[in-house]
Amino acid sequence: MSEPFQPADARRFEAALRRFDQENARDPNQETADGVAQPRELLYARRLNDRVLRLCPDASEPLRLAARCQHLCRWEIARSSYPMTRAGYLQWRATLKKFHAQKAGDILRELGYPEDVVHRVQDLNLKKNFPDDPETRVLEDALCLVFLEYQLADLAAKTAGDKTINALQKSWQKMTPTARAEALKLNYGPHEKALLERALKA
């Protein structure tokens, strides 16, 4: 049986999670979960955090922090501020990664985290050394599973089937066998299940 998680400084760790949640609670976009409307990025952060801990109960402090701030204040840089092209999308995503990492680093430094921890969290935010870094793989697995469980239905409803299948295939390629097994256990609607089956057969 593994030892209970013990952060280097419990008060500092809890303060960091609170700060991340406070920032994400400002999201003007709402999403309903269990019948309650919640700030979208706050809900996303908690779902990602939960999935990381289910995949890796012994997750390190930097990985736990990274899971909680991966999309920190994402709404502040709108997709519409970049060209509505593939190149524009990629530029937007690259900018967001740096933005999240910078904001997370600012908060962690303010709370007194040492630079090695700050840099480690930012490296995870930026998904550096993927797929060689085991913790980055856990984070990517969790990101893919949150997408499949909570975002696939919305994407499938708004996007052409071939594009959704392409997104599914890209996610599947990045996932470990453990995450793929978890993905197959998720409850999908008939349309989403059919798309996933097509993606895996292609």
Model regions: which residues?
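Divalent metal-dependent phosphate-bond-processing catalytic cores, especially two-metal-ion Mg2+/Mn2+ enzymes
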Residues: 2-18, 22, 35-42, 46, ...
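Short, charged, low-complexity loops and linkers
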Residues: 22-31, 83-84
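A ubiquitous short alpha-helical element
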Residues: 32-36, 87-93, 134
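His-Asp-centered metal-binding catalytic motifs of divalent-metal-dependent phosphohydrolases/nucleases
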Residues: 61-80, 100, 104, 123-129, ...
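Long, low-complexity, intrinsically disordered polar/charged segments
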Residues: 66, 81, 86-94, 192-202
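Membrane-targeting and insertion segments and their boundary/processing signals
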Residues: 71-78, 91-95, 119, 138-142
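Helix-adjacent hinge/juxtasegments
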Residues: 80-123
